[in-house]
């Protein structure tokens, strides 16, 4: 019979879903809500009558007898209640990390939720006290200790933390996880994720532990101490074959030197811890995305240890005797470790990008789903661009023209892959073929210009999963094929766009009675007028006559025809009688318009 694993159901589920940002944990929180609704229904704990709900709440009356006799899902229900509070706490912590600090309201919510999670964890331990499977029971106990440690570290707002309790809980949890991992009852990735999350806290609250042997020995001491002899988790471990031993290290083993040959630089690692962590990290070759955490963890430990070594041992006589230029030697090692950390992060993001690209290829034609996936891939490409920019600024990299050009090409590769593989497809699905063609043309020009700047790609200095000659050629072929596939549609769209409805052109429905309708006129946007249009109208003659009365012209010599007309007009005027009001000395007034504009 396979035992239920609470650790995999919580921390393992987090690792599988790649929860990294606050929005990821918010989505995870929503998923937990749906699971809890389903579990409450299956456990018959739904109270439909909400009047005086506290007296009718079935969840508060759960006890160990219900867990033993009714269903084991009650334990899962309580477990996920605590996990939901932890997910909200992780969301607030990540938001505070981005902002730089917690808001006062967030501090209160964080403390309240972690305190509630502690109460839920205590209830979980109490309800599952008769669990027959020691594997499940041990994980319930370990989960409860992790929740209490989380509350003491981040939830309880005191200047002085309970160092002894925090370090003791974490040590026992680490012992349980290591034992279950050795028995192949827990996946190594899940255990490493938890250890990486809380190892720094263990080092800090246990008295500034530094080396791996020191941490191992502290864990063994906590398990074997008289203080924990009555602890249920310790009893379960000892009864089921726990045999972790202390590690003894000699001073001679700590003076191991390791040579580094990186590009044109040579250096020697003096500190044994740095050499050990670096060797362990570089020996890990991840085949899955979750395994990158192990490699990064080892390399970051090497970085921390080397920075500590520089701060405390720089420019000392014993080191100067072993290395000619110790300061330069230390800086080379520092740059080398940072280079490998960034390169590992880039490889991880590259695998994530490949994973999302495979999901993109399997998507249906639904535009919202493709748009959501595109945004996820765009976020990964931004991370890749940032990591590549950081690695290009490292000492020893920005002065290496060949390596720098290949890193720049790698950055361009991912940007063009996203534009031509995803964004152009989205434009095509919306019928905007000219924009899609513009993306292909721009990608082709940028890639050709970049390749012309690089002398040769015969020797690739980056890992094959990041950049290779085949991948560059494949991208070139994709760009050419994509451009060829859309150029005809773009030309057709351009013609239609060029002959589209003008400002004063009539629509189809306006041409029904008066004008001939051509097949090219029939378009969805040209069937009937959608917006009011301002059309020109002819001016009224009366307005022109009114203006003419007030226009004067320069005197010009009249032509023969004008003289003849004027003579005829004079004769006709002389025949009309002149009123008594007009005198010979008065000038003639121009007639006004309706008697309003006369003078």
Swiss-Prot record:
Molecular function terms, GO-annotated: 7S RNA binding; endoplasmic reticulum signal peptide binding; signal recognition particle binding
Keyword Cytoplasm applies: yes
GO cellular component: cytoplasm; nuclear periphery; nucleolus; signal recognition particle, endoplasmic reticulum targeting
Top-rank lineage group of the source organism: Eukaryota
The UniProt record lists the keyword Ion transport: no
Region (Disordered): 559-599
Ranges annotated as biased composition (Polar residues): 559-582
Localization annotation: Cytoplasm; Nucleus, Nucleolus
InterPro entries recorded: SRP68, SRP68-RBD, SRP68_N_sf
One Pfam assignment: SRP68
Keywords: Cytoplasm, Nucleus, Ribonucleoprotein, RNA-binding, Signal recognition particle
One Gene Ontology term from the biological process aspect of the record: SRP-dependent cotranslational protein targeting to membrane
Described function: Component of the signal recognition particle (SRP) complex, a ribonucleoprotein complex that mediates the cotranslational targeting of secretory and membrane proteins to the endoplasmic reticulum (ER). The SRP complex interacts with the signal sequence in nascent secretory and membrane proteins and directs them to the membrane of the ER. The SRP complex targets the ribosome-nascent chain complex to the SRP receptor (SR), which is anchored in the ER, where SR compaction and GTPase rearrangement drive cotranslational protein translocation into the ER.
Family according to the record: Belongs to the SRP68 family.
Subunit relationships: Heterodimer with SRP72. SRP68-SRP72 heterodimer formation is stabilized by the presence of 7SL RNA. Component of a fungal signal recognition particle (SRP) complex that consists of a 7SL RNA molecule (scR1) and at least six protein subunits: SRP72, SRP68, SRP54, SEC65, SRP21 and SRP14.
Note from the entry: Present with 6280 molecules/cell in log phase SD medium.
Name of this protein: Signal recognition particle subunit SRP68
Lineage: Eukaryota, Fungi, Dikarya, Ascomycota, Saccharomycotina
